[in-house]
Regions:
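Short beta-strand segments
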Residues: 7-8, 56, 107-110, 140-144, ...
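Left-handed beta-helix
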Residues: 204-359
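Residue-level signal for inorganic ion chemistry
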Residues: 37, 93, 112, 155, ...
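Conserved N-terminal catalytic core of the sugar/cofactor nucleotidyltransferase
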Residues: 1-6, 14-17, 21, 29-110, ...
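Short histidine/acidic/glycine/proline-rich micro-motifs that form metal-
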Residues: 113-115, 145, 270
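Conserved core of the sugar-phosphate nucleotidyltransferase
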Residues: 118-232, 236-241, 262, 335-336
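Short coil/turn connectors at secondary-structure junctions
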Residues: 1-2, 50-51, 73-74, 101-104, ...
């Protein structure tokens, strides 16, 4: 059987002040009139039924997720007591799935991606699921670069692995960390590197075996926890799991070490919606190359992105190359070249208790 695990943790700090600790970006309407999580659920609804879908998220937003998405039930939520990066999030979902369906295939999606068209995504997932059911491999979806991007990790293609109906998979030769501008340009021109999308397909058995090889301590914690699932001791065991397990990404912790990784060339329109700069790539622009969301008036302003989610209007005059975000309690004004440094601003705010209510 095919299952979906949607990773919906994280604080979305680079979307502050729209995204906050108690209202992170996966619960916000950024790319459409639906929340990011709702968009993700809709993408796979015609392929995998909701009862075979779980959302891995923080306990602190479990209630909000259920309230804003009435179709979801408690059984759809796997709540982490606190975030510990994606290796544990994936392992947490995999151990639950394996207990329920030992031969199950697991599709891992992120709740903060922009993906079009939905139909092509389902074709790709179906192709990958067929491979994962047949072979002991770990599959990642690679995106053809559309620009020399320094903010993404890359995957170097090896020999062809499989193909079907125009879709092709390759052995992964090597994972590459986020490159500098020169390397990114080489990857873009060379066409042998793909963006690492953070979407994966594997059997629960295959990923747990990989964790056991690459992160044996984490695997032992996961299997100890699995013994308590459905018992009165589960909550305490889950807390112990998250307290003791290493905080590492699935890419660094497992995929970069594994020798059975395959990448599918995913011919999709894709963006990871990682920061306010993503709005320029997914939103319509006016004649002055501005992006405007909410009640705004932009006069003699160029190359700016504005978001007004609060009361009143947001007006600009004679400015350029800015990101301006207004809520009912905060206004952020940042130059586009610095908008990815929002975390440094938040770090300063965290040092002063006066600002805690705005985080």
């Amino acid at each position: 059987m095919i299952h979906v695990a949607i990773i919906a943790g994280g604080k979305g700090e680079r979307f502050w002040p729209f995204s906050t600790r108690e209202n992170p970006k996966q619960l916000l309407k950024i790319a459409s009139d639906k929340t990011m999580l709702e968009e993700t659920l809709d993408r796979v609804a015609d392929f995998v039924p909701l009862e075979q879908t779980v959302i891995v998220t923080g306990e602190n937003i479990r209630k909000q997720i259920l309230e804003r998405h009435p179709s979801l039930k408690e059984s759809n939520i796997l709540a982490e007591p606190f975030g510990k990066n994606t290796c544990l999030a994936v392992g947490f979902a995999a151990i639950h799935l394996h207990k329920k369906d030992p031969n199950g295939v697991m599709i891992v999606l992120s709740a903060d991606h922009y993906i079009k068209p939905k139909e092509r995504l389902i074709d790709i997932l179906r192709f990958g699921a067929a491979i994962a059911e047949r072979d002991d491999v770990l599959i990642t979806l690679g995106i053809n670069p559309t620009r020399p991007e320094t903010g993404y990790g890359y995957i170097e293609l090896g020999e062809q692995y499989d193909s079907f109906d125009g879709l092709i998979s390759f052995r992964v030769k090597q994972f590459k960390e986020k490159p500098n501008r020169t390397l990114a340009q080489q990857y873009y021109i060379g066409r042998m590197h793909m963006w690492n999308s953070g979407m994966f397909i594997w059997s629960a058995k295959s990923i747990l075996n990989a964790i056991s090889r690459c992160k044996p301590e984490m695997y032992k914690l996961l299997t100890d926890y699995a013994e308590t699932i459905g018992t009165p001791g589960e909550a305490n065991a889950r807390l112990e799991l998250f307290e003791k397990a290493e905080g590492v990404s699935i890419d660094v912790g497992v995929l970069e070490e594994a020798n059975n990784v395959v990448v599918i060339k995913a011919d999709l329109i894709w963006d990871d919606i990682g920061s306010w700069l993503a709005l320029e790539r997914i939103s319509p622009k006016d004649k002055d190359n501005n992006v405007s969301i909410g009640d705004t008036i932009l006069h003699e302003s160029f190359e700016i992105s504005t978001v007004n989610s609060g009361d009143g209007i947001l007006a600009t005059l004679g400015v350029s190359d800015l990101v301006i975000v207004k809520t009912n309690s905060v206004v952020l004004v940042a130059h586009k070249t610095r908008v990815n440094d929002i975390k440094s601003l938040l770090a300063r705010m965290k040092d002063d208790p006066r600002y805690d209510q705005y985080l």
